């Protein structure tokens, strides 16, 4: 793999596989208006809504899909299993971060945070102090800007 974009002040990287092929047995999130002819970054951009009706609101339900604590929790007798946790928006985005009450453990950075319709609204990146119930995500507007550069 090769990093094609990164930024020091945002815990986010855009990577591209050298062979440009998705590994087998990998789940790909469906994108709104999926069109196989469009580029990957164009497809990523469709994850984000631009209508005022789609703006996040305080107390709106959010979900995070990931591997809290890595293999410690994910490794089961039936194999590696993902966890889905939920919480609510507790502070609206300031353009750099979105605060929500989704519980996380170490290993959750990079997990997608989605709304009730499956739209990506943030990428999880930090905890607030020692609590596991207030966490920050990189909001969609920062991700869009990151992808444009």
Task: List PLM regions with ranges.
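Short, acidic, Ser/Thr-enriched surface-loop or helix-capping motifs
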Residues: 115
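Flexible, gly/ser-rich surface segments that form the specificity/activation loops bordering the active-site cleft
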Residues: 42-98, 104-108, 124-136
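Short conserved active-site loop signatures built around small residues
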Residues: 118
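Conserved active-site neighborhood of the chymotrypsin/trypsin-like protease fold
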Residues: 1, 5-58, 65, 70-73, ...
């Amino acid at each position: 793999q090769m990093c094609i974009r990164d930024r020091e002040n945002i815990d986010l990287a855009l990577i591209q596989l050298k062979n440009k092929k998705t590994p087998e047995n990998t789940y790909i999130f469906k994108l709104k208006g999926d069109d196989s002819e469009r580029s990957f970054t164009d497809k990523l951009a469709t994850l984000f809504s631009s209508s005022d009706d789609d703006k996040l609101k305080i107390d709106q339900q959010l979900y995070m899909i990931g591997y809290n604590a890595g293999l410690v929790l994910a490794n089961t007798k039936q194999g590696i299993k993902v966890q889905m946790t939920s919480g609510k928006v507790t502070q609206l985005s300031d353009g750099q971060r979105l605060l929500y009450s989704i519980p996380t453990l170490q290993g959750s950075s990079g997990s997608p945070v989605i709304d009730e319709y499956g739209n990506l609204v943030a990428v999880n990146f930090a905890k607030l102090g020692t609590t596991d119930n207030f966490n920050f995500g990189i909001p969609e507007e920062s991700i869009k800007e990151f992808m444009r550069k």
